Design a protein with these regions (language model features):
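Alpha/beta-hydrolase fold catalytic core
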Residues: 1-33, 56, 97, 273, ...
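Conserved HGGG/HGGXW glycine-rich cap/lid loop of the alpha/beta-hydrolase fold
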Residues: 19-72
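Active-site loop/oxyanion-hole signature of alpha/beta-hydrolase fold enzymes
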Residues: 47-51, 61-103
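Short beta-to-alpha linker loops that shape the active-site pocket of alpha/beta-hydrolase fold enzymes
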Residues: 63-67, 132, 263-264
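Conserved hydrolase catalytic core segment
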Residues: 98-137
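Conserved alpha/beta-hydrolase catalytic His-Asp/Glu region
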Residues: 154-211
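Conserved serine/cysteine hydrolase catalytic core
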Residues: 190-250
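Catalytic histidine-centered segment of alpha/beta-hydrolase-like enzymes
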Residues: 263-272
Length: 293
């Protein structure tokens, strides 16, 4: 496992300073991997996966605007899928990356689907972590209930307890040490040394604005059937149903898919079955260098 990485900042078209953590390839040849996080999450969720993958390829783990070390947007109406996708393309262009494999968790998975539809020649494959063209309203309501709305905590122990309370139903079996690590990935210390969620609370406005609410994405899925895809579903997921995955397979017979036991929304991508599936997917679709034109 290689943890060597560097900080990379770039500017959005509307002037926000955005952040990406870059794990350089130890050996060249493989396509870069772009990791895109879930709604309230950030690049730190991909540390283990990036360290696993960068033996053979560069790995970019992005903080979406309003998360992590990326700037908060003064206009919360920009916290929506088209803006995030535009930022992702800008990141790739700023690094002169012509072709990439996208690994997206939840919101990041939807970003990967949109990117594949927009420029399929640049997307060699997409790994969809517990999201697809149909979103279960039950899971969406649960996420809307906590996104940007968590009560304050006063210590890292309380942050870990809050993380367990919020996500424990999706991640049974994690130890207290695991939950503390999970908290450190989703919280940061404010000026007073108190842990706070590492996200702009105004991202939750996307759930109350009809123009930014998730749409029927089956037509989008139909557009990208030619793009290789791997779907990772948590067996306990309340966002991506088994029925949705079954329909995805019916409509795209070469769709690769696995179900991860004892995981809901979302698998952590450090599970052995996830790593094995991603490794196999990259061996098939991610083995050509793609920097420059």
């Amino acid at each position: 496992m290689n943890l060597d990485a560097s900080d990379y900042f770039y500017d959005s078209t509307d002037g926000l300073r955005l952040y990406c953590r870059i794990y350089p390839a130890l050996r060249t040849g493989g396509l870069p991997v772009l990791c895109l996080p879930g709604l309230t999450r950030n690049s730190r969720d991909f540390v283990a996966l990036a360290a696993h993958l960068n033996a053979e390829r560069e790995v970019l783990t992005a903080d979406l605007r309003g998360r992590g070390r990326s700037a908060w947007d003064p206009d919360p109406s920009h916290y929506q899928l088209p803006t995030y996708v535009e930022d992702a393309w800008l990141l790739l262009d700023s690094r002169a990356i012509r072709r990439v494999v996208v690994v997206g968790t939840s919101l990041g998975a939807l970003m990967g689907m949109v990117m594949a539809a927009m420029q399929p020649d640049r997307i060699a494959g997409v790994v969809l972590n517990d999201a697809g063209p149909e979103i279960n309203p039950t899971g969406l309501r649960r996420i809307a209930g906590y996104a940007g709305k968590l009560p304050p905590v006063s210590s890292w122990a309380e942050a870990a307890a809050q993380a367990k309370s919020t996500y424990g139903i999706a991640l049974p079996g994690l130890t207290d040490e695991d939950w503390l690590d999970y908290a450190h990935r989703g919280y940061r210390e404010n000026a007073g040394g108190i842990p706070v969620p590492d996200v702009d609370p105004k991202i939750s406005q996307a759930f109350t604005n009809p123009s930014t609410a998730p749409r029927d994405l089956w037509p989008l899925y139909a557009q990208i059937k030619g793009v290789p895809m791997l779907v990772i579903r948590g067996a306990l997921s309340d966002l991506l149903s088994a029925a949705t995955v079954a329909r995805m397979v019916r409509e795209k017979s070469d769709l690769e898919h696995i179900t991860v036991a004892n995981r809901g929304h979302t698998p952590l991508l450090n599970e052995p079955e996830c790593l094995a599936a991603i490794d196999a997917f990259l061996a098939r679709y991610g083995e050509t260098a793609a920097h420059g034109d």
